[in-house]
């Protein structure tokens, strides 16, 4: 379904015009789950269709528990089941992912900051050093106890088991091993803050550079509710002289609270945005070559989401038959922090912790 309007088309033309008038400029992208929904991957927070909504009717203590490190320690099976469905290789990149690859090929891509854990930016061909996965990914694994790093195959091999009978444990400390996905209660990777510190300084340098070769940078935010900090703070920290673009179905975050005169707002699906921007830039032929070489995009089917919910529902029903009400109550109390003197300690620093977009 298209949501294009005359105003969105005009905004896309302005983006293309900015890039054409600054031929040596580079672009920073900040993206969220909205760029992957056309691939069949659910986002987390959309009412009625998001992953949390579809998990809400299951027997988990609360939907977000599947990404809770404490719950994972007590019961890894729900996450293993979900990971089996979401694991890289089950989905193909969208047109927007290939737009990132096109920008890289045109040497105008500075960085992609992504909240997504699906690694579809990598699958589309974007180089590792241009991607900052703020909430981690399946690209490697680590022990939740001592931090020892493991190759992803160690975890993936367990997902091939049917049914999953045991879990990967560290050969050093014996704790569980999981993909390097940031769970609730875990810090974001150091690369996130370190790279953004350098890139924000780079932005300031570029807007003060004068000369014969215009290179005013551009920051494009796509497919995110900007509801999760610290990622949501990035648009706020963009220097005021840098043009910001938001492509999203709704105006969100700092674009809504503190809209700047130079901001461009595009209410559009990310794939439509990619198509129109490529057309305005005159890059259709190169874009088609990328799409052809990669064998096409992910489809728009929601069948994968239904399979995820079905598998988790069966898992939860099976668990409920073998778990006493008393055990459930104790588990829920522990997760809510009622058996700890440090109840609420994590909340005091929650703005610095990661959550899923």
UniProtKB/Swiss-Prot annotation:
Keywords: Acetylation, Cytoplasm, Metal-binding, NAD, Nucleus, Phosphoprotein, Repressor, Transcription, Transcription regulation, Transferase, Zinc
Deacetylase sirtuin-type domain ranges (all copies): 5-284
EC number: 2.3.1.286
Cofactor binding note of this UniProt entry: Binds 1 zinc ion per subunit.
Binding site for Zn(2+): 143, 146, 170, 173
Note: Present with 5260 molecules/cell in log phase SD medium.
Protein name, UniProt field: NAD-dependent protein deacetylase HST2
Origin species: Saccharomyces cerevisiae (strain ATCC 204508 / S288c)
Lineage, top ranks: Eukaryota, Fungi, Dikarya, Ascomycota, Saccharomycotina
């Amino acid at each position: 379904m298209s949501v294009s309007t005359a105003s969105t088309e005009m905004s896309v033309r302005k983006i293309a015009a900015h890039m054409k008038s600054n031929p040596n400029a580079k672009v920073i992208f900040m993206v969220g789950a909205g760029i992957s929904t056309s691939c069949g991957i659910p986002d987390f927070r959309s009412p009625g269709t998001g992953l949390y909504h579809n998990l809400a009717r299951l027997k988990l203590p609360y939907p977000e528990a599947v990404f809770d490190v404490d719950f994972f320690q007590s019961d890894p099976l729900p996450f293993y089941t979900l990971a089996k469905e979401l694991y890289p290789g089950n989905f193909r990149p969208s047109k927007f992912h290939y737009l990132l690859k096109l920008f890289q090929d045109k040497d105008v891509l500075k960085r992609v900051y992504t909240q997504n854990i699906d690694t579809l930016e990598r699958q589309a061909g974007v180089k590792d050093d241009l991607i900052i996965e703020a909430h981690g990914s399946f690209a490697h694994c680590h022990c939740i106890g001592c931090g020892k790093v493991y190759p992803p195959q160690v975890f993936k091999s367990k997902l091939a088991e049917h049914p999953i009978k045991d879990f990967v444990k560290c050969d050093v400390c014996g704790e569980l091993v999981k993909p390097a996905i940031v769970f609730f209660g875990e810090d974001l990777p150091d690369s996130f803050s370190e790279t953004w510190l350098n890139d924000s300084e780079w932005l300031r340098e570029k807007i003060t550079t004068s000369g014969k070769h215009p290179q005013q940078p551009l920051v494009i935010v796509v497919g995110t509710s900007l509801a999760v900090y610290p990622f949501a703070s990035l648009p706020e920290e963009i220097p005021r002289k840098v043009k910001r673009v938001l492509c999203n179905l709704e105006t969100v975050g700092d674009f809504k609270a503190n809209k700047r005169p130079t901001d461009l707002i595009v209410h559009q699906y990310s794939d439509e945005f990619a198509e129109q921007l490529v057309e305005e830039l005159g890059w259709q032929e190169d874009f088609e070559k990328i799409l052809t070489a990669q064998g096409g995009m992910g489809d728009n089917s929601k069948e994968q989401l239904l399979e995820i919910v079905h598998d988790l529902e069966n898992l939860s029903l099976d668990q409920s038959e073998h778990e006493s009400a008393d055990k459930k109550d104790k588990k829920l109390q522990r997760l809510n922090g009622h058996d700890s003197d440090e109840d609420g300690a994590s909340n005091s620093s929650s703005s610095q912790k990661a959550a899923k977009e």
